Amino acid sequence: MIGGGTTAIEAKILNRHITCIDVNEEALERTRKSLEFEVDNKSKQRVVKCDARNMSFIKDNEIDFVLTHPPYADIIKYSEGEIEEDLSGIHDIDAFVDEIEKVAKELYRVLKPGKYCAILMGDTRRQKMYQPLAFKVMERFLKAGFLLKEDIIKRQFNCKATGFWVTRSKESNFLLIMHEHLFVFQKLSQTHE
């Protein structure tokens, strides 16, 4: 779920090794192109087509830190149905969080004990009713074994579609969702289990 590749760029600049995964080849190619610059450090970037629910090429307890910003169900579709594994094609929220739980279990497997996993997640509306998608996802990460270290609220500014939604919210009598949650989870170290 590398998306546009900005995390990979920052990792390269900051001399961090990074493994970038996505099921969408266009996202991976965009990331590869964005990494075509020189830096004076020894950072390594690994860009792999892979479903986050099955990262078999990564060993147990191999990863030091996870940072991900998965789709919020089908709010934004990152492929138009042509990629079966694309989580952004799932409309039903319960089905979506069932699949995210599989991601959480796999992230727990690959993360080293005592290390952290950060996930940026927002909420949505269905039939004009607020859907706490972020909290449903948080619950699945907790169920997978993670502990919640922090819930950082990120305010959203200057979103591309804000004008459209301001008009729609006034017409339909609902408030805009102006925040996302950055959940920081920790995998217990083996001495604390």
Language-model features, listed with the residues they occupy:
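Class I S-adenosyl-L-methionine-dependent methyltransferase catalytic core
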Residues: 1-193
